């Protein structure tokens, strides 16, 4: 018996086939994300059936037990795909019901940050911690929480949209129309904005040399500079880490986690980012000399965490 976990983002639909209790994919497949609900269902079904076919090529006894969907969207507790800024054209769509009707097995769905949170809690950097916050720094910011050993989803399934917490009242306008949200400053896009500001001020010439111009500088160029141990980049990462820590401090005050797991594409910045975030966070906590420190650790499961967690949650739902 296998489950298939999906990570459905704005660009790709990634599927992994898993055995119960294991984070190691038996097979993987990927396809393009479509912006029509019915076509998206077709894509998910095609990937799922392809994975089962791949497994049956060597073992014809393989049976699909359940499917888990981790989606970069507002997914409500009834499996309705409500809204996703990166998947335009799909609103209030009964995604779980439609996929279940096509595949004939139990189907669950959650936000992709929530499923990645569960993967890290169950198999990764959060093992052994009943109170954990997961912060994924990518194009935006996704978060998820384990409280008392269980995922915290909130009343309607929408808990974890922390990237939209207001950090600066009346601050710069985000693509969502909100002003001064955390992810404007502390995401991959935020790192690019900060790097361009530094370069324009003559503080990051090495990034200009890589990108060709100030305007062309992106977060990926900063990754290259970190990998090359370029001395110009460490002060930039320290300032960026402070923006990350501001939002994390809010989570610490509200949730009191034992540990914060740092995931998403920006974990490629590695120890330089992690240590700077942890130091900045420690300095922002009231009464820090009289309470346990909250360690910040790097996620362990990489880009497949969302799909692995979705598969694990699908198995959990069939117990």
Predicted regions located by residue number:
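ATP-binding/phosphotransfer module of carbohydrate and carboxylate kinases, centering on a glycine-rich
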Residues: 1-66, 75-80, 97-105, 122-129, ...
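Residue-level detector of high-confidence beta-strand sites
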Residues: 26-28, 84, 154
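A short acidic/small-residue loop/turn micro-motif
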Residues: 31-34, 89, 159-161, 167
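A charged helix-plus-loop insertion that forms the helical arch/lid used to bind
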Residues: 80-91
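General beta-strand structural signal in soluble alpha/beta enzymes
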Residues: 107-111
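Short alpha-helical segments enriched in small residues
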Residues: 114
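Glycine-rich phosphate-binding loop of actin/hexokinase-like ATP-binding domains
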Residues: 127-189
């Amino acid at each position: 018996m296998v489950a298939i976990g999906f990570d459905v983002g704005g660009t790709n639909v990634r599927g992994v086939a898993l055995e119960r209790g294991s984070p190691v994919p038996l097979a993987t497949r990927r396809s393009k994300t479509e912006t029509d609900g019915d076509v998206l269902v077709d894509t998910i079904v095609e990937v799922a059936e392809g994975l089962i076919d791949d497994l049956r090529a060597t073992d014809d006894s393989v049976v699909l037990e359940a499917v888990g969907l981790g989606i970069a969207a507002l997914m409500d507790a009834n499996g309705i795909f409500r809204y996703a800024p990166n998947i335009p054209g799909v609103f209030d769509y009964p995604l779980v019901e439609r996929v279940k009707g096509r595949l004939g097995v139990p189907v669950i769905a959650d936000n992709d940050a929530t499923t990645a949170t569960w993967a890290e809690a169950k198999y990764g950097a959060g093992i052994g911690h009943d109170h954990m916050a997961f912060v994924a720094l990518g194009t935006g910011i996704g978060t998820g929480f384990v409280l008392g050993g269980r995922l915290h989803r909130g009343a309607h399934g929408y808990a974890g949209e922390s990237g939209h917490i207001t950090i600066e009242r009346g601050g710069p306008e985000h693509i969502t129309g909100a002003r001064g949200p955390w992810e404007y400053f502390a995401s991959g896009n935020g790192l690019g904005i900060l790097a361009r500001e530094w370069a324009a001020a003559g503080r990051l010439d090495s990034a200009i040399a890589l990108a060709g111009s100030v305007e062309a500088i992106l977060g990926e160029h900063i990754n290259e500079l970190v990998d090359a141990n370029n001395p110009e980049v460490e002060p930039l990462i320290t300032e960026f880490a402070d923006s990350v820590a501001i939002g994390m401090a809010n989570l610490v005050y509200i949730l009191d986690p034992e540990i914060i797991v740092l995931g998403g594409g920006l974990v490629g910045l590695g120890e330089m980012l992690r240590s700077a975030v942890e130091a900045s966070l420690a300095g922002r906590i009231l009464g820090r000399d009289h309470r346990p420190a909250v360690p910040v650790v790097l996620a362990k499961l990489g880009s497949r965490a969302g799909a692995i967690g979705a598969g694990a949650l699908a198995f959990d739902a069939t117990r």
